[in-house]
Each structure stands twice: as structure tokens, then as C-alpha cells.
Amino acid sequence: MKKLTFLLVALAANPAFASEGPFVSLRNAHFVILVAFLIFVGVLIKFKVPSMLLGMLDKRAEGIKADLDEAKALRDEAQKILASYERKAREVQGQADEIVAAAKRDAQLAAEQAKADLKEAIARRLKGAEDRIASAEAAALKDVKDRAVQVAVAAAAEVLANQMSASDKSGMIDAAITEVETRLN
């Protein structure tokens, strides 16, 4: 590589390209530039600048490759994490759907139970109302009967008072007292 570079430089510095006078002269600007360039290239080669440049380029390429590998590893890890989160999200969604379905079932059962309880309460209240009505009817009948008995007794007492004599009244009172005594004993 070094020889090829030197050969190209030497061919490029052909005396035919010189502008004036002999080519190998310090007065010829092209010759001076050629010599300076060759010295510069020689110094670069002496201090191993091309190998240092190649080493730096290789090092940079390795750094870029390492960065790319790290980026690929991070991308793979991110994809794994994303897949994990998506799986967890599906599981959570499934659990949420199950919870909602269970809540709907529970609400339906609670509504049915409330309807049954309401029907039972209405039936109890109707039964209680019917019992109160029957009791009120019985009380009214008793009151009517009692009043009828009172009226009948009063009417009978008046009829008897008008038709009975004092001795008959006294005999009836004695008979009633005797009957009460026998019943009490």
C-alpha cells in the first residue's frame, strides 16, 4: 500500500507538469510542494498515523457495532416486556369481564329476591288487612247482636212489666238467683 501511494505521487509529480525551468530545483514550486508532500507522507508513515487512523476507525466501528447490538438487545427486551404487558392486560380484561358478569348475575338474583320479598310482604299485608277486616266484621256483628239483645231484653222487660204482676216478678227474680247460684258452684 505504501509503495503504491509513493508511485502515484511520483507519477503525479511528472516534470512535464512543471510550470517553468527544470523540475528538480528549489526554485520550482511544484518540486518544492512535491518534496514537502513526500516528507509529510513520510512523517505520517513514520509515526504510523495511517494505522492509528485505521485503528481509530476500527474502534469507532466496534463502538457503533456495540451500540447496535445493545440497541437490538434493548429492542428485544422491550418487545418481551410489551408482550408480557399485553398478556397481563388480556388477563386483567378477562378478570374484569368475569367480575362484571358476576356482578350482573348477583344484581339479577338480588332483583328477583327483592321481587319475591315484595310479593311476600304484599301477601302478608293483604292477609293482615283481611284479618283486621274479618275482626272488624266480627266486632260489628257482636255489637249488632249485643245491641239487638239489649233492645230485645228492653222490649221483653217492657212487655213483661206490662203483663206480669208483682208476685210473678218476684218469683222470676228468685228463680234467676237460684240459677246463678247453681252455675257459680
Swiss-Prot record:
The keyword Transmembrane applies. GO terms for cellular component: plasma membrane; plasma membrane-derived chromatophore membrane; proton-transporting ATP synthase complex. The chain crosses the membrane at residues 29-49. F-type ATPases have 2 components, F(1) - the catalytic core - and F(0) - the membrane proton channel. F(1) has five subunits: alpha(3), beta(3), gamma(1), delta(1), epsilon(1). F(0) has four main subunits: a(1), b(1), b'(1) and c(10-14). The alpha and beta chains form an alternating ring which encloses part of the gamma chain. F(1) is attached to F(0) by a central stalk formed by the gamma and epsilon chains, while a peripheral stalk is formed by the delta, b and b' chains. Belongs to the ATPase B chain family. Its main location: membrane. F(1)F(0) ATP synthase produces ATP from ADP in the presence of a proton or sodium gradient. F-type ATPases consist of two structural domains, F(1) containing the extramembraneous catalytic core and F(0) containing the membrane proton channel, linked together by a central stalk and a peripheral stalk. During catalysis, ATP synthesis in the catalytic domain of F(1) is coupled via a rotary mechanism of the central stalk subunits to proton translocation. Component of the F(0) channel, it forms part of the peripheral stalk, linking F(1) to F(0). The keyword Chloroplast does not apply. It is found in: Cellular chromatophore membrane. CDD domains: ATP-synt_Fo_b. This is ATP synthase subunit b. It comes from the Bacteria. It is a single-pass membrane protein. Residues 1-19 form a propeptide. Keywords: ATP synthesis, CF(0), Hydrogen ion transport, Ion transport, Membrane, Transmembrane, Transmembrane helix, Transport. One of its GO terms (molecular function) is proton-transporting ATPase activity, rotational mechanism. InterPro entries: ATP_synth_b/b'su_bac/chlpt, ATP_synthase_B_chain.
